[in-house]
Each structure stands twice: as C-alpha cells, then as structure tokens.
C-alpha cells in the first residue's frame, strides 16, 4: 500500500545519501503525539495533567505521553529504536527534551547505541545552552544540545560587543568535549531568528 511505498522511498533516500557519503538526521518527538491521534492509556488525561509542569503538562494541548510510566517510556524507546534498525538512520534531532524525564533519554541513548555504536543525538532543550541543559549533556543522554545562547551572541558580535562574545565562547569552549557538545543555530520555527533581530533592531 501507500505506507510501503513511503517506506521504500525513505529507504532509497537514506541508501542514496549513504552512497554519496551523506548522513541522515531525523527529527523525533517523544514527548507528545500529533493532534487527533489515539494512543489510549499512553496519553496523559484528567488529574495526570499538571498545569505548568515541564514534564506533566499538555504542551499546546497536544496529546502528552506519560513518559514517567516505565511501560510507556519503554514503548516509546522501542518505536524510535526500530526506525534506526529498519532504515539505518544516522542521527536524531530530539524535540522538546526538557519535557521528558532524563531516565527516558538515557534508556533511548543506550538502546540506540546497541544498534549503532556511533549513533548521535542532538537535543532541543528549550532556552538551554552549555551551562543550562537539564543535565542532559555528559550524562549518557544527549551527545549535544542546541545552543540557544548562540543566537544572542551572534547578534551581540555583529553589534560590536566583541569582547563579551569572546568571553562567552572561551567559557563555553572550556567545558565542551565529545560527550558535551552544543549545536549552533541562528533561528528556528519556535523563535525569532538572527536576521529578524538585526532588522528589528535597526541594523
């Protein structure tokens, strides 16, 4: 059927990329499902929803997985790991990291490493950076987190605040190693980008 066709096309994409020395990163969401999906008891409801909680609230009213439940966590880890087993995906970009327990991330990383010892994950820990990442770096969870500080630092640099940026980079670089990395970005679908900040700032 159409699902098999999509799977075949996805496999062809990965195979052709690998033939050309290109690695494939896939975005995954473990915290929640899409609107109008039915995962039964895996989804938080009623008193299970804790308003204002990073990990037990329903983000934007999306169906929130009860990741604190070991059975739910294990199923989510199994699903994500199966993608790597089936298709040979190289990396994951992990959405909404702060909204899932650290134990789940450690379990996912362990499971993925059993499939591919070189597998890497970069996490989106909203608002985080090298000094603030919910202990997801250097702990066997994420290999890297997106650096939310970098956007501001790039803006500061262009505005001439070079010494403060140099100080930031020196501090950041002193803690980075192969289990504690940051991924730089200048904008995303969740926040204003570098260009918008500069234009709105009159530059």
Summary of predicted features, one role per range:
Residues 1-3, 7-87, 107-116, 120-123, ...:
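Substrate-binding/active-site clefts of carbohydrate-active enzymes
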Residues 14, 18-22, 78-81, 85-91, ...:
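Active-site-proximal helices and loops of the catalytic beta/alpha 8
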């Amino acid at each position: 059927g159409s699902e098999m066709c999509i799977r075949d096309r996805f496999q062809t994409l990965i195979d052709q990329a690998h033939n050309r020395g290109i690695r494939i990163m896939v975005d995954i969401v473990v915290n929640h499902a899409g609107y109008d999906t039915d995962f039964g008891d895996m989804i938080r409801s009623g008193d299970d929803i804790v308003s204002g909680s990073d990990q037990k609230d329903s983000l934007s009213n999306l169906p929130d997985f009860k990741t604190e439940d070991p059975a739910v966590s294990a199923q989510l880890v199994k699903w994500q790991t199966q993608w790597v087993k089936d298709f040979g995906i190289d990396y994951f970009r992990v959405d909404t990291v702060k909204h899932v327990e650290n134990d789940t991330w450690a379990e996912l990383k362990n499971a993925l490493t059993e499939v591919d010892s070189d597998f890497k994950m970069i996490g989106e820990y909203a608002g985080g950076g090298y000094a603030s990442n919910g202990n997801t770096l250097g702990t066997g969870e994420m290999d890297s987190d997106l650096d939310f500080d970098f956007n501001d630092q790039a803006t500061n640099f262009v505005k001439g605040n070079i010494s403060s940026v140099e100080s930031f980079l020196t501090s950041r670089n002193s803690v980075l190693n192969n289990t504690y990395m940051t991924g730089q970005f200048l904008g995303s679908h969740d926040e204003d980008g570098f260009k918008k900040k500069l234009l709105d700032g009159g530059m």
